C-alpha cells in the first residue's frame, strides 16, 4: 500500500515528439520516489510496475494507483498551461481493472472538469493484451464511452499481443504504439525495416496514428522518420523526468528542434 500513500508520490514524465520535429505531447506516469532515489531508479520502478500489473490487481492497488496517476497527470497539464508551455495532451495508461469500473467515464469527466480541461487533451493508453483478450462488455463500453467523450485511445505495446484489425475497430483505437522490439536497431536490420514498414503501411491504410516506443539512437530516430512514423518516444528524445524539470526541458527542446530528425514525414 506504500505505492499510493500521500506524500511520496511524484510524476515522472516521458516526452514524445512528432509532427515536423515539434513536441506533440507528454506522457505522465505515476511512481514512488524514495528519499535518495535517482531518476533511473524511478524509471526502473515504472518498468517493473507495468510488468506486475496483475500483482497490483490481486492486491487491490491497481485502481487506486490509476487514480493517483490520472490526478497528477491532469494537474501537470494544468501547470504547463499556466506556464504557457502549450502542451497539447497527456497520455495515461489504464489497466483492465480500471476499465472494468462501470462508473469510469463519469469519474474521468469529473476529473477533467475539476481542472477545466477538455477531454481531447487526455489520451487513454490500453495494453494490446487487454484489447486482444477481453470479452468483458463493460470494458468495451467504457472505451467506447471515453472515445465518444473525446479522449484519444492508444493501443499500447502493439505487436506483442494478438489484437486483430476487428478488435482495433471495435475499441475505437486512434493510434498504435509500436513495441520497442520492432524499433531497436531498426536502422541496421533490413528485415526489421520491412516489418516496421509493413506495420506503418497497415496503420496508414486504417487511418491510425503511429508512435514508436524505444527510439534511443539518432540512427533509429532517422529511420523512423524515413519510414513515416508519426511520433517517437524513447531515451533518444529524453529520459523520464520529474514534472518540475519539464518546463526547462520543453524550452530547451524547442530551441534545438531544428537539428532533430523530422518525425512524421516520409523521406523524399
Regions found by a protein language model. Name each.
Residues 60-63, 80, 139, 146, ...:
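Regulatory and interdomain segments flanking nucleotide-handling catalytic cores
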Residues 66, 70, 95-102, 121-135, ...:
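EAL-family c-di-GMP phosphodiesterase catalytic domain
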Amino acid at each position: 500500500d506504500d505505492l499510493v500513500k500521500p506524500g511520496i508520490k511524484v510524476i515522472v514524465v516521458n516526452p514524445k515528439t512528432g509532427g515536423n520535429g515539434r513536441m506533440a505531447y507528454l506522457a505522465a506516469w505515476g511512481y514512488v520516489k524514495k528519499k535518495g532515489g535517482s531518476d533511473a531508479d524511478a524509471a526502473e520502478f515504472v518498468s517493473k510496475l507495468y510488468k506486475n500489473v496483475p500483482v497490483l490487481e490481486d492486491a487491490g492497488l491497481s485502481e487506486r494507483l490509476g487514480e493517483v496517476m490520472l490526478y497528477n497527470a491532469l494537474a501537470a497539464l494544468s501547470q504547463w498551461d499556466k506556464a504557457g508551455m502549450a502542451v497539447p495532451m497527456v497520455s495515461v495508461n489504464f489497466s483492465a481493472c480500471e476499465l472494468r469500473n462501470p462508473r469510469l467515464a463519469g469519474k474521468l469527466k469529473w476529473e477533467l472538469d475539476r481542472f477545466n480541461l477538455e477531454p481531447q487533451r487526455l489520451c487513454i493508453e490500453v495494453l494490446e493484451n487487454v484489447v486482444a483478450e477481453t470479452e468483458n462488455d463493460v470494458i468495451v463500453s467504457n472505451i467506447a464511452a471515453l472515445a465518444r467523450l473525446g479522449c484519444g485511445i492508444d493501443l499500447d505495446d502493439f505487436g506483442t499481443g494478438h489484437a486483430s484489425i476487428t478488435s482495433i475497430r471495435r475499441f475505437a483505437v486512434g493510434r498504435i504504439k509500436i513495441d520497442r522490439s520492432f524499433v531497436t536497431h531498426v536502422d541496421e536490420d533490413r528485415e526489421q525495416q520491412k516489418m516496421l514498414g509493413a506495420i506503418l503501411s497497415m496503420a496508414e491504410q486504417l487511418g491510425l496514428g503511429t508512435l514508436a516506443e524505444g527510439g534511443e539512437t539518432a540512427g533509429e530516430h532517422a529511420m523512423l522518420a524515413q519510414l513515416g512514423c508519426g511520433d517517437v518516444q524513447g531515451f533518444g528524445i529524453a529520459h523520464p523526468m520529474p514534472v518540475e524539470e519539464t518546463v526547462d526541458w520543453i524550452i530547451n527542446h524547442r530551441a534545438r528542434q531544428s537539428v532533430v530528425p523530422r518525425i512524421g514525414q516520409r523521406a523524399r
